[in-house]
Every structure is written in structure tokens, then in C-alpha cells.
From Swiss-Prot:
Function as written in the Swiss-Prot or TrEMBL entry: Required for mitochondrial iron-sulfur proteins biosynthesis.
Protein's gene: ISD11
Taxonomic placement: Eukaryota, Fungi, Dikarya, Ascomycota, Saccharomycotina
The protein, known as: Protein ISD11
A GO cellular component entry from the record: iron-sulfur cluster assembly complex
Subcellular location: Mitochondrion
Amino acid sequence: MPGFTAPTRRQVLSLYKEFIKNANQFNNYNFREYFLSKTRTTFRKNMNQQDPKVLMNLFKEAKNDLGVLKRQSVISQMYTFDRLVVEPLQGRKH
């Protein structure tokens, strides 16, 4: 499929930062830590990928996943949860 271009490093880093930002929006500690861990693991796993087709597919899939993560983080903010023992009492440290 001629005419497609792989995402730039800047685009990928921007997408990564959006994932981290949205994962940090979760009120629930377990969900927040899960999505932070999953984001880091997924991006590191594909960090050395060179094939432009694969990169483009990964980028498109990640953008779709980001949309889901954004919606879920908004929903998460509508509900409150009791703090867990592992969470600091005075706000969150990132």
C-alpha cells in the first residue's frame, strides 16, 4: 500500500505521554497502576520495531486504545473509592 508513512518518533512519544496522562487520571489505584504498567510494557516491547507497515498498524491500534482509555478515565472520575493502604493519604505521587 504505497503512500503510507510510519509515525515519527515525536508522534509516538506524544501518544505515549497521552497514555501516561490518561492512566494517571484513574481514581482507583489498581486501575491506575495497571494501565501505567501496561502502557510502559507495550511501548517498550515495540520500541525497536522497524517495519513501517507494522509501525503504522501499531500506531493506529494505540490511537484507538487511547480513545477507550480516555473514556474510561472520565468514567472513573465520576466514582470515588476508598484509598488503599498502599496509597499515600495526601494526594498521589507520580
